[in-house]
């Protein structure tokens, strides 16, 4: 069974913990309690292949930003979350993706861009097209979720597993990876 380390990143209050807890336990956290860092483990079967996810729910506040490099270094897949009802959180997500590329020294890191709180449609500040355009620019999947209504939560974690499974395959076009069996 494959084990993957998934890191959930985003500004404070965007719903990182709510998404993670909804996926792991099936419950919604009503009260906002800023996270420093929390680890969760969950088995998941995607495309008939079982995996264990070790999910790191990170702090969104700037005072813990210095810890991000370490999280990123150890992560294999990244869920970048912003709130659909907070334009600033959408702007804040861009440097986080840049930080992933800088730390990993690789452009094709498994990343999913997530607009959360789709249940608050009437308060929306970030359009779907803005999210899609950014995901297209980054070459990654884009999803809109709601931890509260459990919209696309399981699909989100299944998709990051697919992205990590794909990234774990040797690149047939890369002479380095096809010349040897190192994975």
From Swiss-Prot:
EC number: 3.6.5.2
Lipid-bearing positions (S-palmitoyl cysteine): 176-177
Impact noted for substituting residue 5 to R: Reduced NEDD4-dependent ubiquitination
Post-translational modification: Ubiquitinated; undergoes 'Lys-63' monoubiquitination and diubiquitination by NEDD4. Multiple lysine residues are probably modified. Ubiquitination requires TNIK, prevents interaction with effectors and inactivates RAP2A. Ubiquitination by the ECS(RAB40B) complex leads to RAP2A localization to lamellipodia plasma membrane, activation, and regulation of sorting at early endosomes for recycling to the lamellipodia plasma membrane. Palmitoylated. Palmitoylation is required for association with recycling endosome membranes and activation of TNIK.
Keywords: Cell membrane, Cell projection, Endosome, Glycoprotein, Golgi apparatus, GTP-binding, Hydrolase, Lipoprotein, Lysosome, Membrane, Methylation, Nucleotide-binding, Palmitate, Prenylation, Ubl conjugation
Cellular localization per UniProt: Midbody; Cell projection, Lamellipodium membrane; Golgi apparatus; Recycling endosome membrane
Annotated GTP binding sites: 10-17, 57-61, 116-119
Main localization (coarse): other
Propeptide, residue positions: 181-183
Coiled coil segments of this chain: none
Subunit architecture: Interacts (GTP-bound form) with RUNDC3A. Interacts with RGS14; the interaction is GTP-dependent. Interacts with PLCE1. Interacts with ARHGAP29, SGSM1, SGSM2 and SGSM3. Interacts (GTP-bound form preferentially) with TNIK (via the CNH domain); the interaction is direct and recruits RAP2A to the E3 ubiquitin ligase NEDD4. Interacts with MINK1. Interacts (GTP-bound form preferentially) with MAP4K4. Interacts with cytoskeletal actin.
Protein name, UniProt field: Ras-related protein Rap-2a
Organism in which the protein naturally occurs: Homo sapiens (Human)
